Amino acid sequence: MQPRSERPAGRTQSPEHGSPGPGPEAPPPPPPQPPAPEAERTRPRQARPAAPMEGAVQLLSREGHSVAHNSKRHYHDAFVAMSRMRQRGLLCDIVLHVAAKEIRAHKVVLASCSPYFHAMFTNEMSESRQTHVTLHDIDPQALDQLVQFAYTAEIVVGEGNVQTLLPAASLLQLNGVRDACCKFLLSQLDPSNCLGIRGFADAHSCSDLLKAAHRYVLQHFVDVAKTEEFMLLPLKQVLELVSSDSLNVPSEEEVYRAVLSWVKHDVDARRQHVPRLMKCVRLPLLSRDFLLGHVDAESLVRHHPDCKDLLIEALKFHLLPEQRGVLGTSRTRPRRCEGAGPVLFAVGGGSLFAIHGDCEAYDTRTDRWHVVASMSTRRARVGVAAVGNRLYAVGGYDGTSDLATVESYDPVTNTWQPEVSMGTRRSCLGVAALHGLLYSAGGYDGASCLNSAERYDPLTGTWTSVAAMSTRRRYVRVATLDGNLYAVGGYDSSSHLATVEKYEPQVNVWSPVASMLSRRSSAGVAVLEGALYVAGGNDGTSCLNSVERYSPKAGAWESVAPMNIRRSTHDLVAMDGWLYAVGGNDGSSSLNSIEKYNPRTNKWVAASCMFTRRSSVGVAVLELLNFPPPSSPTLSVSSTSL
């Protein structure tokens, strides 16, 4: 093949005719240069910039400008490729032997994912130079899944593999997989398996799972105590459970029944443990009928002298209610379930010629109000207090007459049940709980203002008269402080009162203490951080927003920040380190607004409003685990009065 002829140099295309013509005249050659100096001749030549390759693009860019490339799929694609290589046995440099199983892998992949393998392959261990390593105390299938996880970052945790996968992940220090196993077990907690999961977590040092499982056992003890797992527990663990202050039980009867069931599951071997177990049952909190009809009748209990002493202690607690303050022990302290939170209940009240039987409750954890079951009787000017895990609505006014009736609210069943009536009709009364007893003082019986007082024992279902106050008081409030009752202010049918008196249950005596700075009836009274607070009320001329505080140590009252709204016929309660002023009347209308006081800042701020306007309302707080009750409407209202 002949080479293609090239156009002669110095020729160009004529722009006019398109035919060859003479090119431009060549420049003359440069004149000869004189010889360079010696130093110049010996200097190394600098390299010339390389001529651009044919077809290359000459870039003109700002100095220092560059572009970073980041492939988000690089790691994924690389590990996918390595996983395929492992499956085909390519470039594998380690074989793991466990039982009869062989697992091929790459040391660098295992060492990069597992601190266990990193130490094995990078330190001066013999395995670092070996191509075959035998592992012990690990399930073969679990190891295979974890090696595969090292390449794919994916693993499925389920009922079929979690019990082998978790210890294997712990051994290899694959904490992410270990946490996934714990999360799965946490989601599977049930009364039938929670004790087993708790033991499994303890055996493998899964502290968070252990705490969660133990909390679940305490919270669901009634159901857990009926399972086979509970019956097989060793004595030490049973003692740990039934002695816990955090046990969630509707009554101490459940603890007693659980203990007896455990003993009778293997009665010959376990009857010797009955005295130790009964010391953990809070017998004084059982009703007298249950003590005599069940505990004293049980042969396993009756035949042990130590158990007889415990039974006598419990009966003495019942027979001497006025001495409960000095008879108190760990067995007389009500249990408080771990995880329970305070719930504020607003009960009854009235608004615009209406008397309410409905009730609502506020959960601070969710900042929501919930409607709960209505009372069987409409009640305004009612006294409300909590004893144990129940709420009591005492007396009041139903729109026709003043009431002696009492009913209690069970938050577990969301129902109200009738209780034994007081000996006297009372509205506008003061009610408070002390040492498991319910006290009612003063009030109005439909004919006269009262100074009498009486006490209710829920364990025996009986009302007993106690010493009368020195002053007749209706629209009075009563609170408990340092083992004593304080009756604050009120109205004696002729004047609004600033006086205060204190009741000491051990001696059954009322005595005067320092009077308030202002006359107040229908005020709110509560105790917070060792001080007695009184807020609002009526002084005979106007509705008040002023607030004062009494210190028993100083024996004097002092003013604190006033409420934002004038209130009387409201109620005051302490909750979560705050004081809550609930409802009431501002002098012209009933209120559904709430405000709360922070003693650390000495300020009142608005809180979420109730559904319903309520004056002459009763308020108390219960510590509840499961709230709200099923099918309860909820409401979140702005922090202003509607």
From Swiss-Prot:
| Protein's job | Substrate-recognition component of some cullin-RING-based BCR (BTB-CUL3-RBX1) E3 ubiquitin-protein ligase complexes. The BCR(KLHL17) complex mediates the ubiquitination and subsequent degradation of GLUR6. May play a role in the actin-based neuronal function.
Q: Which residues form the BTB domain?
A: 92-159
Q: Where is this region: Interaction with PDZK1?
A: 640-642
This protein's pathway reads:
Protein modification; protein ubiquitination
Q: Which species is this UniProt entry from?
A: Homo sapiens
Q: Where is the composition biased (Pro residues)?
A: 21-37
Give the UniProt subcellular location, in the record's own words. Postsynaptic density; Synapse
Protein name, please? Answer: Kelch-like protein 17
What InterPro entries does the database record attribute to this sequence? BACK, BTB-kelch_protein, BTB/POZ_dom, Gal_Oxase/kelch_b-propeller, Kelch-typ_b-propeller, Kelch_1, SKP1/BTB/POZ_sf
Lineage of source species = Eukaryota, Metazoa, Chordata, Craniata, Vertebrata
All copies of the BACK domain together span 194-296
Keywords, alphabetical: Actin-binding, Kelch repeat, Repeat, Synapse, Ubl conjugation pathway
A GO cellular component annotated for this chain's UniProt record is:
cytoplasm
